[in-house]
Amino acid sequence: MELKMKLFEKIFAFILSKFWKNKNFVYINSNKKNLNIESIKSLVKPSDSKILNCQTNKTASIHSLKSHFVKNKIYLYQIQKNIRDNYTFYYCGFPSQMFSIYDGYVLGNTQYPKFLELGSNEKFYSVDFKLKIKKSETENVSDSEEINLVIETSYIIDKNKLKRFPTYYFKEKAPNKITGEYLNKVYNFTKSFLDKCNGYKIKKVNLYITSKPSVSYVVGTAIQTYHPNVNVYEFMNNDFAYYLNLNKGRIEK
């Protein structure tokens, strides 16, 4: 997927991409809170893997979201330029769902990472994911130009906070420990639902999601360029005021 970047951002990212020496890497994307790199080192093989540390912890404003997103894109550009099929790639962090979805949207056709998720015991564990495409049965959608898709894999979203459009749900809660099987279920639902939208006059899908990073990332990989435009909403200051327009690669209000 082509990144939408300003020219000076792309030039800076291009220069950084030329200094890669290690083919194996860990991509940490975190803007909710910082991830302690020491807490994941025992899971990373080989141990000398390159660390791509895209971390900030200020999320109280549209400015902070946009600032992190610029940093996010610079790392994604470097990954796109350097990743190969035989590379080992880890993904972890505490990002806004919009950012992990964007990561999956951009990198999904490149290679799936090993996900590092934080367990209920406050220790990280590794999740291997191999895509198994299977058509998922989804309900029929109304012939509306704009709809809502709500993916609730952790907590329930207040429906009164949603935009007033026909709304469709994925409500299967994630297991305590994320598995490849569950990630495939989420992927196949998302892709099948958006594929079905193509048969109607739907032009825009408002996506609201509660999920761990691995789930959000896989949702992003399921979204294709031929699908209706997807806007991923961010819950901040008790409202869904801001969203990431995936097609434009831009945070909007």
Please report, for each region that a protein language model flagged, where it lies by residue.
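Long, low-complexity, Lys/Arg-enriched
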Residues: 1-208, 213-253
